[in-house]
């Protein structure tokens, strides 16, 4: 299995997502203190890779539509992502 490598900003966003219930874009932005447009860009990349999922489905995730969307960790990658976060 391939080892997941994440940037510091990707790690911050993934750590801000609640594993049990998910988090809205606004909650993620508040927890990370990253600019909204940058959070939207990071979330879009994580969704494209498959590490995160967005509800309701919007493609692409943009600064205009991320705030009210709910983001969850993809259960298929949950263990690998937790391991990647522990390494840093």
PLM region descriptions:
Residues 59-65:
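Intrinsically disordered, low-complexity Ser/Thr- and acidic-rich flexible linkers and loops
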Residues 22-31:
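Short acidic, hydrophobic short linear motifs in intrinsically disordered regions
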Residues 33-49, 53-55, 68:
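Short amphipathic alpha-helical interaction segments
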Residues 27, 53-58:
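Short amphipathic alpha-helical segments at helix boundaries and their inter-helical linkers
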Residues 68-88:
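Short, amphipathic alpha-helical interaction segments positioned at domain boundaries
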Residues 15-19:
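Short, locally clustered residues in the helix-turn-helix/winged-helix DNA-binding domain
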Residues 1-13:
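Short alpha-helical segments that sit at the start of domains
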Residues 5-6, 34, 73:
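Alpha-helical hairpin
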